[in-house]
UniProtKB/Swiss-Prot annotation:
Pfam families per the UniProt record, alphabetical: Ribosomal_L1
Name under which the protein is recorded: Large ribosomal subunit protein uL1
Keyword annotations: Repressor, Ribonucleoprotein, Ribosomal protein, RNA-binding, rRNA-binding, Translation regulation, tRNA-binding
HAMAP family assigned to the protein according to its UniProt record, in alphabetical order: Ribosomal_uL1_B
Length: 231
């Protein structure tokens, strides 16, 4: 077990691990925790009731946070022709086709979101082994395979977050920064839970959202009483 920092241990003393906190209480606790040397992300960790081994019970999509994530999202667009200028005008950080594919094949992945026009997907397929494990492979379900590259670029820059369950059926994603004021964090958190609650796969049975924990990047988790928000 890794040795915890003094700051982490001090933060953990503030949290009653037997209690489920209201959203307001949880955000107040987050604000009371000792700060790291950088502006930590605030992350949601959601345990779901899906069976992740079944292909018809995968959670994949996007949510939009009213106040964004606070992160400068680097967006890459695979496209050609007139769409190149559309993507650049919308604020994409990297735009192109063959040259980007070659860079990625050499190991470069210095971006957060990859968007592609449908005509590029056959060529991008060869990047699956590199982009797939990193959650960067463009997908129609995630809204990252589209002809409207300008809208997609703007949306991800503004705070759209891609959602995908891990191998254990859990979801992990940022909802803001610790520097956000409490009201903005609350609005992002509530909005995220409301949107996630509508993403239950049709084949999934029983409760969808089983447990919700909110935590700073370098701090302990705080269990939320999420029932009033999602049920």
């Amino acid at each position: 077990m890794p040795k915890r920092s003094k700051r982490y241990l001090e933060a953990r003393k503030l949290v009653d691990r037997t209690k489920a906190y209201t959203i307001d209480e949880a955000i107040e606790l987050l604000k009371q925790m000792p700060s790291a040397k950088f502006d930590e992300s605030i992350e949601l960790h959601i345990k779901t009731g899906i069976e992740p081994s079944k292909s018809d019970q995968q959670v994949r999509g996007t949510i939009s946070l009213p106040h964004g994530t606070g992160k400068n999202v680097k967006v890459l667009v695979f496209t050609r022709g007139e769409k190149v200028e559309e993507a650049k005008a919308a604020g994409a950080d990297f735009v192109g086709s063959d040259e980007l594919i070659q860079q990625i094949q050499k190991g470069w992945t210095d971006f957060d979101v990859a968007i592609a026009t449908p005509d590029m997907m056959r060529e991008i397929g060869r990047l699956g082994r590199i982009l797939g494990p990193r959650g960067l492979m463009p997908s129609p379900k995630a809204g990252t395979v589209t002809t409207d590259v300008a809208e997609a670029v703007k949306a991800f820059k503004a705070g759209r977050v891609e959602i995908k369950n891990d191998k254990t059926g859990n979801l992990h994603f940022p909802i803001g920064k610790k520097s956000f004021d409490s009201e903005k964090l609350k609005e992002n958190l509530v909005s995220a839970l409301e949107q996630i609650s509508k993403m239950k796969p049709a084949a999934a049975k029983g409760r969808f959202i089983v447990k919700v924990v909110v935590a700073p990047t370098m701090g302990p988790g705080i269990k939320l009483d999420h029932q009033k928000v999602v049920e």
